[in-house]
Amino acid sequence: MYSIIQKICEKHNKILKEGLEKVLKGADISSLTSAIADFTNEIGKDLLAEIVKQIDELVFEDSKRQKEYESVRFGERKYITQNGKTKFERRYYEDKETGEHIYLTDKILGIDKGERIDKKVKSEIISRANDQSYKKSGKGVVPNVEISGTTVMRNVRKNDWKMEIEEKKEEDKIKAKTIYIQVDEDHIKQRKKKGCTISKIVTIYTGKRQLTRPEKEEKVVQIRRELVNKFTFSGLYKDNQELWEDVVYYIDCTYNKETIENIFIMGDGANYIKEGLNWIPNSVFVLDLFHLEKYINHLNYDEELKKKLQLAIEQYDPISTENIMNEAIERIKKEITEDKQLGRDTKRLENRLKKIEDTKTYFINQWSGIEAHDKYKDKLTGCCQEGQVHHTLSERMSTDAKVWSEEGIDEMSQLRAFTQNGGDVYAKIIDISTAEKREKKIEELEKRIKRKAKRKILGTTGVKIPSLTEARGELYYELKKMWYGIAI
């Protein structure tokens, strides 16, 4: 190993020498740091190719391999690493028993079939794509290499970003009296489709914790809070059963059921949200106040009726609420009749009538969710799902007139939730890569080769970089002059 690194260092020593010379001639230290970066990147690329070559030789020389696999030819692979783009050759083998063709060295090194980008680089571009466009995500990750937006997109889509949920031991499960489940959706423009596609989001938590210190409350515009034990699901979830199965499974794996007293499902009252009541025993639906206010504002055209409606709802009076809505409907109908008699266009009023009739139906259908605010007022902490929708989905997917494919909506929604749940992108890529079961004989070969590599390749790693270690080299004298002020 020593001789390999020494040889590579000598090959690229010129880069480091030029950087030092620039500093001696008056350039600032950035010239040197840039040269050091280029130097280490060149070493990294060549070192990788050399190690692959030596591993390949060990595979070729392995006596047991010779009985099981026939060497067919050499194959070149171009590979993008953190140091830049490199290339290396390794042998292509044929399984004598099955006839299957395989790069054994790739298998040993954990390089997947057809893989052209190192997994660490993949994790970086995917992590960037979580927050910015695919095109921007491929820039500046690898020295002198720009990874295309299409390549970034493919790497996001080829992985399943659903968080793996592991059941906790009973003694480790969260003991909580109340669980809050906020459910909402974002409307995202889909390519080649009229209208928008819905991406659903579920946020599960056990309460809110104030982050703003009490002594600063009067000085800030908004008090900052965070959700306790927060976990997020997101995706298309076209099948509502799949959505609620995931939620129920997470609760079963994470929470101690003996301590749970209340489970509140909060949202706008859509059927798929209320479906959760059938999946989670003793759960209660709570209409979120954002959507309640939105429907109350449908009466903005009539301040008198709107104030009456607000008062009736604040008093949790369903009869008065229905009567006020009936009054609003009758007033509009009367206006329509009068305008028709005068020969005026009534389309605007007819649209308003439809809207107010729908609003009345909404209040009637969601009344139990409205009353829940009164019945459980000591246990509710308020619904903040609109903020969760914006933070998880809208920021990346529905602002600035972005357009997505259906697959892209699903994958990015899952990825955004995955990272917010603390998921490790690199670890996930490795898990997916190693999930495929390998043949026993390849695993045995890998163990043998790694033992030999440790002994034959690693060895001593002491390395001398010529420019820095020559006892009386050119740079030695230049640096000496600089120290004593002879050279400027």
PLM regions and their residue ranges:
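Short acidic, Pro/Gly- and aromatic-enriched capping/linker segments at domain boundaries
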Residues: F60-Y79, I370-K379
